[in-house]
Amino acid sequence: MLLWLTNFLSQHFHAFRVFNYLTFRSIVSALTALILVLSLSPRLIKYLVSLQVGQMVRNDGPQTHLKKSGTPTMGGVLIIVAIVISVLLWGDLSNRFIWVILLVTVAFSAIGWMDDYRKIIRKNSKGLSARSKYLLQSIIGALAAVYLYFSATTGAETALVIPFLKNVLPNLGLFYIVLAYFVIVGSSNAVNLTDGLDGLALMPTVMIGAALGVFAYTTGNHFFAQYLAIPYIPGAGEVVVFCSALVGAGLGFLWYNTYPAQVFMGDVGSLGLGAALGVTAVVVRQELVYFLMGGIFVAETLSVILQVGYFKLSGGKRIFRMAPLHHHFELKGWPEPKVIVRFWIITFILVLCGLATLKLR
C-alpha cells in the first residue's frame, strides 16, 4: 500500500527511493510486525483474561500441564493481524503470490478461530468436528493449489526442485495440484499438533519462515537464481516481505509465549502459521527442503499417526507413552523447557541443512 505512495514521492524526492528496495521493505515489514505484537500483547492478554478465554488442559496428559489451565489463549489472532497489516503496508499489492499467501493464512486462521471459539467460548470441548475442519482446510488448500497451477507463467513454477541435484527439474503437471494441496493442509495440521508446549511450535516456525524468506529472495532474483542453479520465478522475491512479517510477529509473540507462557496462540495461530509456511514453500518450489527443515513437525505428525494406527492394530498397545512426540519425552521425565529447547536446536540444525542445499548441488 505504501509502495504506491513512495513510488510517486520518489519521482520528486530521491530519499523515498529507498522504499523501492526489497531488502529495506522486508526489514521494516519485520519491525512493523514485531512492534505491533510487542506493544499490543499486554492489552490483548488482559482482554482475554477479562473474557475468561482460558486454555483447557487434558486430564490424561502430563500432570505438569494442569497449572496451565486458564492461561489466556487465542492470542494467535494478534500474530495474524500484525502479519496482514505489515504486508499490506510494505508489500507490492500487485503481486499475486502475496495475495495467495495472505488469503490462505487468513482463511486457515479463520478455521482455527472457529475451533477455538467453540471449545473455549461456547465450552464445547470437541470444537469443530474433525470432518468439518478437514473439509474446510481441503477446500481452501485445493483452491490455492489450483490457482497457483493455472496462474503459472513459467514451467519452473510447476516443476519439482530436488535438493542437491543441479538442473533436475521434473515438471509435475497436474500432480503439482496434489502436492501443493498436501503440503498446505499437512503443514497446517503439523504445526497445530506441535503447538503443545510453550513456544515449541512458534520458534521453529520463525526459523523456517526466515529460511523460506532466503529461498524466496534467491528464487525471485535472476542473478542469484542463475548463480545457484535454482529455478527463477518472477515475483517470488516479494514473498520475502511476508516472511519477514511472519518472523517479526512470531518473535514478538514469543516474548509472551515462552516458558512459562503468559498467553497461547491457539488454533487460530497454529493453523494459520502452518498453512503460511506450507503455501510459501510451494510458491518458492521448496517442498522437499521444507520437509527437511520442518523435521520436528514431521516427527510430531508421524508420532500421532503411528500411535493411533498401532493402537488399533494391536488392540490397545502403544508405541509412545503419549502422542504427539513432545508429550512422550515429558512423561519420560524431561522438564518442559528441556524438551522445548532441544526441539528448537534440532530445528536450527535442520534449517541450516536446508539452507545448505542452495549451494550444495
Curated annotation (Swiss-Prot):
GO MF, any single term: metal ion binding
Catalysed reaction, written as an equation: UDP-N-acetyl-alpha-D-muramoyl-L-alanyl-gamma-D-glutamyl-meso-2,6-diaminopimeloyl-D-alanyl-D-alanine + di-trans,octa-cis-undecaprenyl phosphate = di-trans,octa-cis-undecaprenyl diphospho-N-acetyl-alpha-D-muramoyl-L-alanyl-D-glutamyl-meso-2,6-diaminopimeloyl-D-alanyl-D-alanine + UMP
Record GO cellular component, one term: plasma membrane
Cofactor dependency: Mg(2+)
Keywords tagged on the record: Cell cycle, Cell division, Cell inner membrane, Cell membrane, Cell shape, Cell wall biogenesis/degradation, Magnesium, Membrane, Metal-binding, Peptidoglycan synthesis, Transferase, Transmembrane, Transmembrane helix
Broadest EC class assigned to this enzyme: transferase
Topology with respect to the bilayer: Multi-pass membrane protein
Transmembrane segments: 18-38, 73-93, 97-117, 135-155, 168-188, 196-216, 235-255, 263-283, 288-308, 338-358
Compartments (UniProt record): Cell inner membrane
Pathway: Cell wall biogenesis; peptidoglycan biosynthesis
EC number: 2.7.8.13
PROSITE patterns, per database record: MRAY_1 (PS01347), MRAY_2 (PS01348)
Disulfide bonds: none
GO biological process: cell division; cell wall macromolecule biosynthetic process; cell wall organization; peptidoglycan biosynthetic process; regulation of cell shape
Function: Catalyzes the initial step of the lipid cycle reactions in the biosynthesis of the cell wall peptidoglycan: transfers peptidoglycan precursor phospho-MurNAc-pentapeptide from UDP-MurNAc-pentapeptide onto the lipid carrier undecaprenyl phosphate, yielding undecaprenyl-pyrophosphoryl-MurNAc-pentapeptide, known as lipid I.
Protein name: Phospho-N-acetylmuramoyl-pentapeptide-transferase
